[in-house]
């Protein structure tokens, strides 16, 4: 379990929702739902598991979650996310290509059916449901509550369900469309949670049955009421239009904005987009700018409808996105916007919590490093590394960490000027002297600690310059790597000794980040310089090509292979005369033939 996951686990909410596990490449490998996100997600990283789950956990490098309004919504969202992303660990469990829906047919005598195909046939579709068992259970309850036609018998012939009071097709005229429309609306309201009317009617019937001592019938009404209670959490309805919509919500705090977009495709919530950034104007203005950029240059598919929060001017959104803009005022659509907004708030709060936790840990690590070395808290740390390959293009680099964070504006690069050949000690001596003589001369802020990427020899050279040549009193430590080029041990003291440091400590992680960063910065600079030198040397001796024209070529083509692939016109277009461009192509052609 990495540090990011550890921090995120501490911030999980006690809410229903979906969690999304990702691997090292950011690929979604598993989607799950939970009544309580905190308990469920934490369970993956604590305790023992079967072999299959252990394999899944071994690949998890990060996770996300989406808070929902209920466990039912989490279940439906899980289904949609699995269908859309096909995570490899879900597919093994749920490889069915379609999920069941409950359908009210568009027939003269409408029927309730379970189907796995959604068609534009005028029917009403409810779902999707996780499996046929769940759909069957709900349909069974609907059959007992709403007397749709239950059989294929002709309308003039009664069926078994008629005697149970569950089918009215025999008594309702085919042309009485008002009755069937009303019944459809009752089902839609029921599955959307507006079931108070039905529950009250059932309670009245149960009471009357009890008063008449019809206890079996009263028990049936009781069971129906309990069944409704299990479905109290709102089900999402899919109509035959299967509309594509984007749902926007945003939240602002501490100068930051988080925008969440829910993508609804064919009536199903399948994905979300999360973006956090500092905002500088009024929040509504910056939100509008974000929406405009979101769809700019076909970055995202523009759906038929976009839902936005009530406080946003829809005419301004319409000006930048040519589609129907809706500000839902009530009902399910408004709840979708509220859900996007709620998730934006949760995401932004998580960012702040992670940042605060990281700051606390980093500050603690800095203080502990000071205690380990018996020096004041090293708020400003400057680290050095050399880079050369067989003595060519020798360079050095310095990175600066302030309060445990990189201060990139203070980074410095050094070309080694006085050393010939591969001599790390002499290179380190030159760089340390150049850096800290300038600190003294220009009155720059000195560091609280100098870190040398190297062993005893490099540290002693740096100390000699600081103490004996410049007369400064700055603590110097060394970070020595093992044979795998990984941070291995911290050297400090006079004489130098290894400072014990647990490898799973925040102090070790901080020093490792510093060493990795200075090495990255140095090696990148060395490659750039070596590339320029190679570029320049290959173009030496070409008639008419002086330093300024070489610079033009370097700026335009970046590297030698690009020049070799360029046409004559390409070279001329960057400001090189035709005759010189011809000389360049001829020279490079000869160079290739030699090689």
Swiss-Prot record:
The keyword Phosphoprotein does not apply. It comes from the Bacteria. One of its GO terms (biological process) is SOS response. Keywords: Cytoplasm, DNA damage, DNA excision, DNA repair, Excision nuclease, SOS response. The keyword Ligase does not apply. Residues 196-231 form the UVR domain. SMART domains: GIYc. InterPro entries: GIY-YIG_endonuc, GIY-YIG_endonuc_sf, GIY-YIG_UvrC_Cho, RuvA_2-like, UVR_dom, UVR_dom_sf, UvrABC_protein_C, UvrC. Pfam families: GIY-YIG, UVR, UvrC_RNaseH, UvrC_RNaseH_dom. It is found in: Cytoplasm. Its main location: cytoplasm. One of its GO terms (cellular component) is cytoplasm. Residues 14-91 form the GIY-YIG domain. The UvrABC repair system catalyzes the recognition and processing of DNA lesions. UvrC both incises the 5' and 3' sides of the lesion. The N-terminal half is responsible for the 3' incision and the C-terminal half is responsible for the 5' incision. Interacts with UvrB in an incision complex. Belongs to the UvrC family. This is UvrABC system protein C.
